[in-house]
């Protein structure tokens, strides 16, 4: 029998509902329960795939090829449970499905309305594809209570609470308790008003997570409990912490997991085993050294655009017991003369994914600096493509080498995937048409060449499964020319058609991959490429 915990937010956005949901999932796992986390997003986009990184942050890709909210990355990293397409639903997707059903005549001529048709579709998104033996489904509702676009979602979960009853549903509300320096006290009024807003749509929260920069005194907790109609023990101080990997420990100390079990009349038993959480938090707080890695990107004004990437570097640091200090560098600055000197002193250079011509030449210059100065390098997706173009121009004597993404070119080292096969289904794509649904998405295999750095880094396995998100591929027809100048194609699709990994044998550590390894990295299971990259940076820093 699956129990549902709904997590909502109030007062302001970006309070950390995703981290709170993931931390609760980790605590329940530590007590022996199975969990699955889901996110309902109120925006009208069908998915975040075509949204600007400046608007939404990164797009998290699942094994089954869904482009989802970045919070699903937190869910995976904290619980180790791989997300699926069904774990993220948006208003756009819900409305698209309902309208498609109306066009097919599924509603038999009925007037299609928000209630019951949209709310029924939302309830289906909450409950479908869940294993019958799943203990807990944690459902995060995006947005802030009081937003117009959130109302259908709140109504749907209110109905589920009524239909399933309190024995199977719980409502957790994340709110803000700000400290006002001039008054010298915490203010509870925003929380009171936020809860009232939630009560106005028929939802009584069972627990309050109160974001604050200091512990809430007992008298203030009592006051919040009184005004918001919750148990005092269910008013949890969600304190600011120095690392997100301390959040499960902090919430446990505040009694969050015990209160959830009490609500569902489940045995609390002994203490959960949080040893591994304490161990990684200790490494993050007290590392053996520091390495500096430059991320040369084009969306650095919103760091959420690279959320999984930054976390994967933290994981690589944990594996090597060092702190990774990230130097965020706008790739466009390298399009100016002598600006690559900005990279002197870093112990590693990472060129991440991206789309479009803006900043591409700067990324190519960053690749060249890493190659010529023997600085450890990791290129991801677009970053690998820029590494191949750099080799073609500066080593293979192909100065006109470029990508057709930037326009027609004489030497299309990188080109649009006009067709490719997955299983027995041949899919065709063209440069014209809608952008949505035109990429190679999800998990695909890569065969690793024996004796390569890539295969060694992966522990000697011959084939790996990695997540992809790209429209363009390195042109395999240039393989011979590029390998002749030292750029080895060390990973290919099993049919040998699509280049997946490139590297230099005469470089301390230089790897470019067409996929996104950061999407599979976890604090307790760092991705081998990030462990290896950070280890190379440690050697570069002369720490070992």
Curated annotation (Swiss-Prot):
Protein name from the UniProt record: CTP synthase
Sequence positions that bind Mg(2+): 71, 140
GO biological process per UniProt: 'de novo' CTP biosynthetic process; pyrimidine nucleobase biosynthetic process
HAMAP family linked: PyrG
Family: Belongs to the CTP synthase family.
Reported regulation of activity: Allosterically activated by GTP, when glutamine is the substrate; GTP has no effect on the reaction when ammonia is the substrate. The allosteric effector GTP functions by stabilizing the protein conformation that binds the tetrahedral intermediate(s) formed during glutamine hydrolysis. Inhibited by the product CTP, via allosteric rather than competitive inhibition.
Native organism: Granulibacter bethesdensis (strain ATCC BAA-1260 / CGDNIH1)
Record keyword Electron transport present: no
CDD domains with a match to the protein in the record: CTPS_N (cd03113), GATase1_CTP_Synthase (cd01746)
Job description of the protein: Catalyzes the ATP-dependent amination of UTP to CTP with either L-glutamine or ammonia as the source of nitrogen. Regulates intracellular CTP levels through interactions with the four ribonucleotide triphosphates.
GO CC annotation: cytosol
Additional free-text comment from the UniProt record: CTPSs have evolved a hybrid strategy for distinguishing between UTP and CTP. The overlapping regions of the product feedback inhibitory and substrate sites recognize a common feature in both compounds, the triphosphate moiety. To differentiate isosteric substrate and product pyrimidine rings, an additional pocket far from the expected kinase/ligase catalytic site, specifically recognizes the cytosine and ribose portions of the product inhibitor.
Pfam families for the chain: CTP_synth_N, GATase
Organism placement in taxonomy: Bacteria, Pseudomonadati, Pseudomonadota, Alphaproteobacteria, Acetobacterales
Residues reported in the UniProt entry to bind UTP: 13, 187-192, 223
Assembly behavior: Homotetramer.
Binding residues annotated for ATP, in chain numbering: 14-19, 71
